[in-house]
């Protein structure tokens, strides 16, 4: 057999190995123990079997053994640090149970959302300002103390209440026109600044479930009609035209603690009609429609008298 060495070659090889090396290599020692008397053996088959046994032992030696075990790249020498161990598996499971953080948004997306929010807010404010301007244009200036949103809304509420009361007074007047009125004759009470004429002045007073209405004057003189509902007064004055007449009348009416909320002026030939919407302020001494109609009648008669005397003095 070509793979087997002769006894002489083995002897030469064993002569070159030191004692220390022979002690470390167990297969060679076993070989020497097995082959004590090589020349005394008469059976060549026994010698061949011994050599085969030696080669088998050499193949199993720790010096010549080659391991073909492939190491897992994820496996470590320390079993405690191996992620496939029991503790490692628990750690992986615990990591999977953690709450996933939300991915950060893109800067462009964040900027887009911010610009959209700004545009929506600007549009809302623009619409609100348009509504407030429309509401402001429908109200008299006397209801607007300031130009802020709260004042405009509060003034609109007050104006609506005034309109409701005016509507009630007009409905009362309409019902009153359908009933019989009892005229009464009264004399005009003159003051130090008022010259009373000799003409008779008729005064009509009617009551209704919504308020009290009084008429004062008639004919070619100043005619005043007042309707009182709680602390609101609807006043209508018909008189002849006069220079700066309405300005003086407004000043005198406000001196009576009557706040002018609304004023409408219409004319017919030589006469002019003033429609006032008044509110009785604190400290107003006039409490009834008769008192208000009488006071306003005196104011316009005084103004017309002053105009008449000024015209006479010029001539």
Swiss-Prot record:
Q: Which GO terms describe its biological process?
A: guard cell differentiation; regulation of DNA-templated transcription
* Principal place of residence: nucleus
For bias type Low complexity, the affected ranges are 185-197
* Gene Ontology MF: a single term: protein dimerization activity
What residues does the bHLH domain cover?
112-163
| PROSITE patterns cross-referenced by the UniProt entry | BHLH
List localization entries. Nucleus
Q: Cite the entry's keywords alphabetically.
A: DNA-binding, Nucleus, Transcription, Transcription regulation
- Does the keyword field hold Hydrolase? no
Listed under subunit, the entry gives: Homodimer.
- Protein name per Swiss-Prot or TrEMBL: Transcription factor bHLH57
Residue ranges annotated as compositionally biased, kind Basic and acidic residues, are 172-183
Q: Where is the composition biased (Basic residues)?
A: 94-104
Q: Where expressed (tissues)?
A: Expressed constitutively in leaves, stems, and flowers.
Record's note on what induces expression:
Repressed by heat treatment.
Question: Does this UniProt record's set of keywords contain DNA damage?
Answer: no
Q: Name one GO cellular component term.
A: nucleus
User: Cross-referenced PANTHER family, in alphabetical order?
Assistant: TRANSCRIPTION FACTOR BHLH67-LIKE ISOFORM X2, TRANSCRIPTION FACTOR FAMA
* Source organism, top-level taxon: Eukaryota
Region listing for Disordered, in residue ranges: 66-111, 172-197
């Amino acid at each position: 057999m070509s793979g087997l060495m002769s006894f002489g070659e083995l002897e030469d090889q064993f002569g070159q190995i030191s004692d220390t090396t022979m002690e470390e290599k167990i297969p060679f020692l076993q070989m020497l123990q097995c082959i004590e008397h090589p020349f005394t053996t008469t059976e060549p088959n026994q010698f061949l079997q011994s050599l085969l046994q030696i080669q088998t032992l050499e193949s199993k030696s720790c010096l010549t053994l080659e391991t073909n075990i492939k190491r897992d790249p994820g496996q470590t020498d320390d079993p405690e640090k191996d992620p496939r161990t029991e503790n490692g598996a628990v750690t992986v499971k615990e990591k999977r149970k953690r709450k996933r953080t939300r991915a950060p948004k893109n800067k462009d997306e964040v900027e887009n959302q911010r610009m959209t929010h700004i545009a929506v807010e600007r549009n809302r404010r623009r619409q609100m300002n348009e509504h407030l301007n429309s509401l402001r244009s429908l109200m008299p200036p006397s209801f607007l103390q300031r130009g802020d949103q709260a004042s405009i809304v509060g003034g609109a509420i007050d104006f609506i209440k005034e309109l409701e009361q005016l509507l009630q007074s007009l409905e009362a007047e309409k019902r009153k026109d359908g009933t019989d009125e009892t005229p009464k004759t009264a004399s005009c009470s003159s003051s130090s600044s008022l010259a009373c004429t000799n003409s008779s002045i008729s005064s009509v007073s009617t009551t209704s479930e919504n308020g009290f209405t009084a008429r004062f004057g008639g004919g070619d003189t100043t005619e005043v009609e007042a309707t009182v509902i709680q602390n609101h007064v609807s006043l209508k004055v018909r008189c002849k035209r006069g220079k700066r007449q309405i300005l003086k009348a407004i000043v005198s009416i406000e001196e009576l603690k009557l706040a002018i909320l609304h004023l409408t002026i219409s004319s017919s030939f030589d006469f002019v009609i003033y429609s006032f919407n008044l509110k009785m302020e604190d400290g107003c001494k006039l409490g009834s429609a008769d008192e208000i109609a009488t006071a306003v009648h005196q104011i316009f008669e005084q103004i017309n008298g002053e105009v008449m005397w000024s015209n006479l003095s010029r001539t």
